[in-house]
């Protein structure tokens, strides 16, 4: 069995490839810079560049809000020539700072962890397709995609004439393009396989009779120039530069794909589109037109490439060098103009490179803030694959075939783990064994079955290559050698499923989880779940909150250990030695005569406000080995991932409190801190140096609001703060208006010219819902380029302890999610035959319709494991061993638990897995036996404390005069269509009228209503229409429709027209 590669390995390999190869490649492209008079030459030495070790550590960069980066030094030479002498000066100069990847596979920019995710793009090369035109006739096209995404289309019509389109503009003859590229008619006809098809264009000799005419025609179409341009050498050079060199650059990957598709032998370093490529592409298009070739599947992974962190960082480095070149040219010109002596150091500085990476990490769509909700989230985020981003697709234009699962995804992209919503299928996740190959392709490992050697050899295959082999399905892994010779096994061949003899098998899978992502691989019994529910579970595991008392799962899959190890949450011994000292802050390890200090994470805030904390697990004097675990991190126990709790669950309805995914829980989960979690919130205030003042003397504020401030006006560590308390006292000076001057102030200003200032209270106050304990206060200085713009910010970190409560969201590992609806006293909960009350009650109707039966297997096996004190690690698709293997395993464990505990009710043959339980309120047994078990239940980050919101007054929409929408905008309630139906159903006409009209969007009436409610008067009835109705009338008028209403008399039925 092969070992699973590190989950962060793709990020590490990409960054190392950028450092080892990408920097050298881009520096080799840096040109030799000369002035117009050739007096000064400036160039870089490719052989000599170095990255120095970062000046700060990762922890300090996060704490002080700095960028964890390394300085890049390059050797440069300057040659200065004048009439008599020649000066040569060589220096090692600093050209900028490059952010360095941390041990988490992420970058630290301004104290924030950021990750660069991988992007899937269409690979450069040529692709042949067939589409139906408006007349229902098949049109065959060959599309040449350049390295940057530009397109050149070859199209063959019914008369077998070949046309060319540039960026989907008007088509022109292929002979015009070839002539503009430098070929004459004779060379064209001699180098194609079907010259007779090209002769049909020769009637128009005026356009293609000469190279000049072809260049003019092509330039007119390409540049969209009106009129008749005149040929010149500059026009020809402009066309060569803008089109044939910039827009038609294939790159190394594109050149390789063109050679393989068209059977060419053009050197790999020739990365531009050549006339030979166009001729070969036209020949292949003619063959496909007449049925002598195959079309390309654009969604096949062999036609895609991965744009990794190495490619993105190298691209930004090349952009920075272009800016550096322009700076050097400008400084050389300034040196000659102002007659000052240049040196390599003063020709360039570090600003272009540093600013380029600063903008990239802040604004680029593929640079995202690392999600650190729990350890699993960190490693999954770095393994994402995105079709979105620059050069990629958009969520609005991506079609269903692009989002759908493709057979080439097998073992490379997880078919389950993807986003929900508009980005479904566009953001995927790497399979756990996949890796990125040399040419940007996704490779998957297989075992090659050889007759010569008894053992199997592992090899990585790129997409498309495995289709030429007979690949055995995963169930063949369980067959021993004796049975294999007689068995027929299912296999894959050319995207089809076959049944073949074992002797015909050439490759087989290496691991049961090979085609799943990390999130899907952590779901036990995943084969018994619907794929939609498995997708939800993969996403919800990343939303689990680390609990204060973590507990590892009874039923797992075996990947929990490596997930915890690769997440960086654990403290690992890098050397063997002896523990010299340990406390909650650090561990001192002595070995080889040195003492190594290992700092531990102490109540660190993640960007999702969860608490990251490490607990030492070694004692003083203990000898440890390299790789041993020294401290557990958040959501880890025993070196394994521990996201939730094993709780006793009954699947039964209970008084309607678990209707529609609601969950009923016991108060034991609250009082014993089973689902208690810690959350850290950050509150920040900026202080301008000079005028603003931090102080604890704030006038006009009550004393109890300032009770936690120290003498400097900042809240003290360890203080317990409530809503409205002052965290930082700040006064901002403001000038008094002329009209508010007192007479004596006006006299002083007139005589002495003095201005009177007052101070405005701009303190940092604790908002609603922020109560907790202050655990840290930081002063952070952010310096701008201008010395006068230096600002300071004070950050206050407050720790909150949150028990589980009504409104919180919980979920299992099978897509079974729900909201806490009621917390019952433990004596009222249903209890088992041994007297134990259950902890949660789930609705059984949520299982059959959603087809996630895996939760039943996990629940029953978890109960058996709890009684037998065992933990199970089960690989998926265990039916490959025998039929009903999962059911047999669960029932056998329940039966054994029943025997060992002498409790026959645990396994009753009449209803295996079910048991008679009793109503805690009456003591009577329920009518039917109920499934009970111990599944692994997670508490998710969607908590009611973050969702609940109230508003008394606030801002209104300028257009509709209704309250704004959303908690972030401090919005209010908006009565929608379904709310109106609910009120109509109860016949509350007056409440409905008030909520829809003068309490909502009637500007004048809502002020009167407020006054009458305060003083206890009768609510007035407004005479005119509310603002939303007036807006509706105005919109109708913009469509030239006038809205009026009429009164019909009962006596005369005459229409008395009255204006609206």
UniProtKB/Swiss-Prot annotation:
Q: Which reaction does it catalyse?
A: RNA(n) + a ribonucleoside 5'-triphosphate = RNA(n+1) + diphosphate
Query: What GO cellular component entries does it have?
Result: chloroplast; DNA-directed RNA polymerase complex; mitochondrion
- EC number(s) per UniProt? 2.7.7.6
Q: Which Pfam families match?
A: RNA_pol_Rpb2_1 (PF04563), RNA_pol_Rpb2_2 (PF04561), RNA_pol_Rpb2_3 (PF04565), RNA_pol_Rpb2_6 (PF00562), RNA_pol_Rpb2_7 (PF04560)
Just give the chief location class.
plastid
Kindly list the places in or outside the cell where this protein is found, as annotated in its UniProt entry.
Plastid, Chloroplast
Q: Keywords in UniProt for this one?
A: Chloroplast, DNA-directed RNA polymerase, Nucleotidyltransferase, Plastid, Transcription, Transferase
Return one Gene Ontology term, BP aspect: DNA-templated transcription
The family database entries (NCBIfam families) matched by this protein are listed as: PRK00405.1
Stated role? DNA-dependent RNA polymerase catalyzes the transcription of DNA into RNA using the four ribonucleoside triphosphates as substrates.
Please give the family membership noted in the entry. Answer: Belongs to the RNA polymerase beta chain family.
Name this protein carries in UniProt: DNA-directed RNA polymerase subunit beta
Q: Which organism is it from?
A: Helianthus annuus (Common sunflower)
Q: What is the lineage of its organism?
A: Eukaryota, Viridiplantae, Streptophyta, Embryophyta, Tracheophyta
Q: Which gene encodes it?
A: rpoB
